[in-house]
Regions:
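SIR2/sirtuin NAD+-dependent deacylase catalytic core
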Residues: 1-298
């Protein structure tokens, strides 16, 4: 299985999809590496009802309603704007020569830092409708400068335009897609119930998915690392982001999967790799070091 993954990577046909658990590889200075750790920081900054203290999206919504959206942004920024270095795995991924698309389904900027070694790349981040009404995605150059989105004339119906890509972004050789937003460069966060409702209302018809992502994913295989698929949000985002890709994928999923995870893996034709993220990364990078095609970059 490792050989198949490396072969797909060597052909430029693999899309790494990273979840929060990958941050455990970055050491003690890393930002929150789970929804549970993040909601603990949110509820330490603002009082929320006991029954939702462990629910990230509900706690964020309560704070947004009874404090202000700016409070959410401030707490999220404080949680993720930490002086953490990319892990060796982040750096290893960023050094792959054929890397058309990476997905980071969390709010950190470690992949951005690792990608600084590359040329001709950029960032697409999901954006909250409460802060960027009518715009699903914010685009950024490696220096953090924002690229204006495609202008559209709204017809007054309230319908939101699709996430068309500015011409400049279609020429990048590598795109980092952060569907939930990210702390850097723009402090975009899809985190509250209302944030998710806006996206999920449209995601089945792909409106919030960046145009470049829809194009690049065709015929590609996804490799999920540091992700779980236990709840509907996790499954919905993964399902819609990988739509119309190839019919072969992999997921590093240690431990006993839930019934919902088992169904999702079968539905999406995702082969489960039952090992820890640490062990998988060690095998993957060791396999690359032993591959004639990848030896020079391992």
């Amino acid at each position: 299985m490792i050989d198949d993954i490396l072969a797909a990577m060597d052909r430029g046909e693999l899309i790494p999809y990273l979840g929060p658990d990958v941050l455990a590889l970055a050491g003690a200075s890393a930002p929150p590496s789970s929804p549970e750790a993040l909601v603990a920081q949110l509820t330490a900054a603002a009082t929320v009802p006991h029954k939702i203290r462990n629910n990230l999206t509900a706690a964020a919504q309560f704070i947004e309603n009874f404090k202000h959206r700016k409070t959410i942004v401030a707490v999220m920024t404080k949680a993720f704007a930490v002086d953490a270095e990319p892990s060796d795995f982040h750096k290893w991924l960023a050094a792959r020569p054929k890397l058309p698309l990476l997905v980071n389904a969390w709010y950190d900027d470690l992949l951005q830092k690792a990608l600084k070694v590359r040329d001709n790349w950029g960032i697409a981040q999901g954006a909250s409708q409460s802060e960027h009404f009518g715009e699903w995605v914010q685009y950024y150059r490696p220096d953090g400068s924002n690229i204006p989105g495609v202008e559209r004339i709204q017809d007054g119906s309230g319908a939101k335009a699709p996430a068309d890509a500015p011409e400049e972004t279609l020429k990048w050789s590598t795109l980092l897609y952060q569907p939930l937003g990210g702390v850097s460069p723009g402090g975009n966060f899809i985190v509250s119930d209302s944030d998710y409702v806006e996206v999920l209302t449209e995601i089945d018809i792909q409106t919030p998915i960046p145009e470049a992502v829809q194009s690049i994913r065709r015929g590609k295989s996804f490799l999920f690392v540091g992700c779980r698929f236990a709840n509907q949000l996790e499954r919905s985002f993964a399902r819609q982001i990988m739509k119309r890709s190839s019919d072969r994928h992999w997921a590093v999923l240690p431990g006993t999967p839930t019934k919902n995870e088992e169904r999702f893996l079968a539905e999406q034709n995702i082969a489960r790799i039952d090992m820890s993220v640490e062990d998988f990364v060690a095998k993957l990078t060791a396999g690359a070091a032993g591959s004639p095609e990848l030896a020079s970059i391992a």
